[in-house]
Every structure is written in structure tokens, then in C-alpha cells.
């Protein structure tokens, strides 16, 4: 929410695409913003509406949203779907739809799962790297090669740059919302409230540093439609 607040205006209308159980939609509604949510999974919608019965949410696929008008949103959030869309072509379908439904010059927030976090925390830390490389799940450049039936796809900054170029999207900024936090979860849980508050302050301060963003578990690419 820290970075969202930097860019959204009080009268902004937002689409939350791939809203899940409505975490972001609920927070934005509580601050007075107008939000329409789209979510693929019916169960998530049910949980969402039980907690937020006045929410405007519709079931749909981020890659094809004919029920949303062209150029309607000041800001579009795409903070989940690209985790699960395997390969450039599927991701581009969602990016192009987000671009279509956003006003020309409006902003799109796009979240990605990062390759290096998974390589370090799963492949090496759990001693799986040799087996994964032997079967081609990780290539010689240590890039995870997700298959079409897998749940997650992982990217590097170069991949995001390529997608932006192909979709005709211009970057405003790119940031890591979590930084090193997923590497040090147990330590964070042991911190005093004062130290944890200082860590949050630190993460906000370094979240846009180009030398750090690719190592976190997620990044959010803020682009202009």
C-alpha cells in the first residue's frame, strides 16, 4: 500500500485483476477508493464477499475480460495473475488486457515471482538443484523452466523488461515489496516491535534500489498504459 498511495489520487477508479480474497480491494475501499475486482476462483470470491459484502467483484480470467470496458480505470492492479501464467505468451495476454481496460496514460501495477529467490531458497537450500537441472527444470543459466501444468512461473528483471517492450508499456518504477524478508522470516518473528518497525522503514527506503530488487521473492513493475 505504501507505493500505491504514492500514485493513486483521491478520485481514482481502480480495477483489481486477480483480486484473490480481496486483500487489496478491501484496503482501498476502506480508504474511500472506487474499486471493481475480478477473480478467477469462485471460492475466493465467496470468501471475499463474506468479509466485504458491498464489494463489486466479478468472476473472470485476467487474459480475457470482455465484461470490462476499454479505458475505464485510472489504475489497474495485476498483483497475482502473472505468478500463475506460464511463459511470455500467456503473460502478454493478461498485460494486453490490463492495458486495454486502463485509461491511456493510466498506471498498471504488475507483480511477478522472482527466479533467484526460488533458486536460493528451494533449489539450493533444500538441496534439490542437481535433480532439477538433470531433468531440465532449471537450465544452465539457473533459470527455472516452468512447464505448462505447473502452478508458478518465475522471472528475472530481463524477462520483465522484455514483456514490457512487447506489450508497449513504459516503466514508471519497479520495486521489491518484501526485499530480504522472506529469507529471514524466523528472525523477523523474533524482533522487538521497535526493531521490526525499523526494518519496515528500511525496506521502504531500499525497495527501488536496482542492485537489490531482483533478489527478493517478488517485484512490482509500475508501468504506464
Descriptions of predicted regions:
Residues 1-10:
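Conserved alpha-helix/loop element of class I SAM-dependent methyltransferases that forms part
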Residues 11-18, 109-136:
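Conserved class I S-adenosyl-L-methionine
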Residues 22-64:
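Class I SAM-dependent methyltransferase SAM/SAH-binding core
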Residues 67-76:
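A short acidic, Gly/Pro-enriched loop at the edge of an enzyme's catalytic core
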Residues 92-104:
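A short glycine-rich, Lys/Arg-flanked "PGG" loop and its adjoining helix->strand segment in the class I
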Residues 151-167, 174:
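Short alpha-helix
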Residues 173-225:
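A C-terminal cap/extension of S-adenosyl-L-methionine-dependent methyltransferases
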Amino acid at each position: 500500500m505504501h507505493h500505491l498511495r504514492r500514485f493513486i489520487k483521491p478520485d481514482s477508479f481502480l480495477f483489481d485483476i486477480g483480486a484473490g480474497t480481496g486483500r487489496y480491494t478491501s484496503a482501498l475501499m476502506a480508504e474511500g477508493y472506487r474499486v471493481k475486482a475480478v477473480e478467477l476462483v469462485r471460492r475466493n470470491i465467496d470468501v471475499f464477499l463474506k468479509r466485504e459484502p458491498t464489494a463489486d467483484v466479478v468472476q473472470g480470467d485476467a487474459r480475457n475480460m470482455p465484461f470490462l470496458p476499454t479505458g475505464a480505470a485510472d489504475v489497474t492492479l495485476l498483483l497475482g495473475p502473472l505468478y500463475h501464467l506460464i511463459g511470455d505468451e500467456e503473460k502478454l495476454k493478461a498485460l494486453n488486457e490490463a492495458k486495454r481496460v486502463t485509461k491511456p496514460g493510466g498506471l498498471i501495477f504488475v507483480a511477478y515471482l522472482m527466479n533467484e529467490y526460488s533458486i536460493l531458497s528451494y533449489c539450493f537450500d533444500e538441496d534439490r538443484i542437481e535433480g532439477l537441472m538433470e531433468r531440465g527444470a532449471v537450465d544452465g543459466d539457473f533459470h527455472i523452466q516452468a512447464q505448462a501444468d505447473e502452478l508458478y512461473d518465475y522471472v528475472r528483471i530481463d524477462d520483465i523488461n522484455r514483456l514490457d517492450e512487447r506489450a508497449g508499456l513504459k516503466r514508471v518504477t519497479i520495486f521489491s515489496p518484501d526485499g530480504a524478508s522472506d529469507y529471514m522470516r524466523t528472525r523477523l518473528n523474533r524482533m522487538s516491535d521497535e526493531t521490526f518497525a525499523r526494518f519496515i522503514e528500511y525496506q521502504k527506503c531500499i525497495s527501488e534500489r536496482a542492485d537489490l530488487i531482483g533478489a527478493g521473492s517478488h517485484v512490482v513493475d509500475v508501468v504506464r498504459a
